A protein has these predicted regions:
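RNA pseudouridine synthases
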Residues: 1-273
Length: 273
């Protein structure tokens, strides 16, 4: 109670109020990448929305998982991905976890990394795209506009390919997280451009080949990566909404990794999809 006197070294337990699950629980095959008492991180497949109210979404599958595992909490997403974007989706298990990890996102200590395939050959090995963006007049897509909110998208080129008709597979990457490895903060310049996570396949594109890039997102505007690369003349492969040639496949964007500081232990955690 407010009248209780506490001393240094005392252990205090806080009972979190039970909450009603706010989405209809629907059984779904979730690929869980990481879980602790405060967070759940899953690998979102292509073709599924995160939390649409008018159709079955990932939120329904998470609600079912919570129900089956006795997690009496609302589903709180800390990030969003477009329907056809795959990879790391982060869910907080409490309001406290949501608040603390959202603060990390706001100050960019919660890192969000993506892998993308873009049309054409990107000349710069790396760059930081700082652009103002807002929703366009049609209400469907977003655009670079001086009146918009400033965004920052950093990228580093992983590999460049000339045009050859081969398979696509960024969204078919092997999903894994090795929790036994030392968690490290990987900077753009330290990326192994020939490592196992780099997709070597080639896409159909009427433009001169395509480029594979590693992207770090510093802000979270809707369609930010798609708009940024379209603005510099290299839309994501297959992203017809933003000017790419049709390929018959979803656009190529994967939320490849998140890096954050554990809210209880202070340990730096890396989770890879």
């Amino acid at each position: 109670t407010p009248k209780d006197v506490i001393s240094e070294g005392d252990e205090i337990w806080i009972a979190m109020a039970k909450e009603k699950i706010d989405y209809e629980p629907i059984e779904m095959d979730l690929h869980i990448l990481y879980e602790d008492d405060d967070l759940l991180i899953v690998d979102k497949p292509a073709g599924v929305t995160v939390n649409s109210k008018d159709q079955v979404s990932l939120a329904n599958g998470v609600a079912y998982y919570f129900k089956e595992n006795g997690i009496k909490r609302k589903v709180r997403f800390l990030n969003r991905l477009d329907r056809d974007t795959t990879g790391c989706i982060v869910i907080a298990k409490s309001g406290l976890a949501q608040s603390l990890y959202q603060q990390q996102m706001d100050d960019n200590t919660f890192e969000k990394w993506y892998m993308a395939k873009v049309e054409g050959i990107v000349k710069a090995d790396e760059d930081s795209l700082v652009l103002p963006m807002e929703r366009s007049a049609d209400g469907i897509h977003y655009e670079v506009n001086p009146k918009g909110k400033e965004t920052r998208t950093d990228y580093s080129v992983l590999c460049r390919h000339s045009s050859q008709p081969v398979d696509n597979s960024v969204n078919k990457s092997q999903n894994s997280v090795d929790m036994s490895q030392e968690n490290v903060d990987i900077e753009l310049q330290n990326v192994d451009k020939h490592g196992a996570n780099v997709d070597k396949s080639v896409h159909n594109s009427s433009k001169c080949g395509y480029t594979e890039v590693l992207v770090r997102l510093y802000t979270g505007k809707t369609h930010q990566i798609r708009v940024a690369f379209s603005h510099i003349g290299h839309p994501l492969v297959g992203d017809t909404l933003y000017g790419a040639q049709p390929t018959g496949q979803p656009f190529q964007l994967r939320a490849q990794k998140v890096v954050f500081t554990h809210m209880r232990t202070g340990e730096r955690i890396t989770v890879t999809a």
